[in-house]
Amino acid sequence: MEVLLTSGPNDTALTWGCYPMVPYAGRVRSGVVRFDNVEHQLPLTLPPHAAHGTAFAQSWNVVDASASRIELFTDLGSHWPFGGSVSHRIELKDDHVNLELRVTAGDHAMPAQVGWHPWFCKPSRTSLIFESMLQRDEHGIATSRCVQTDATNVDDCFV
């Protein structure tokens, strides 16, 4: 059974599969990252904000692979002002899949956040249970406040 949506001829890297969101997940307000008292401008991939990191647009190298496991590696790209790299290990089990992301800073400390953006095939009947999510502000940016949800909108940050 196919679980994740696969790409079509007009799809972008952001509309299918289960891509890693690294070195940031979700939206970065106005694409501005402030770290160590320095402001950095990121590309506005979801105007007027930066979204979903840089790794999805990078070419990945296969480090190791078997019939049920693969380990991939890439740098964080020129659009990430701090350098660094990420490895992604995917392992298929009998009844689940293990996903692991490891982010490594370059020569200096850096902020980092990871997540995955799955696009699931919609079965004829769906049952999802989420207890809480990060509340969004008026611009659609996740805050640090957890709120209860009725899960009617599943394009969110659930905890």
Q: What are the residue ranges of the model-derived segments?
A:
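Beta-strand-rich N-terminal accessory domains
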Residues: M1-H40
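Beta-strand-rich recognition/accessory modules
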Residues: L14, G77, D156-V159
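Extended, loop-rich substrate-binding clefts of extracytoplasmic carbohydrate-active enzymes
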Residues: P43-D94
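A short, polar/proline- and glycine-enriched secondary-structure boundary/capping micro-motif
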Residues: A51-A55, P81-S85, H108-V114, H139-A142, ...
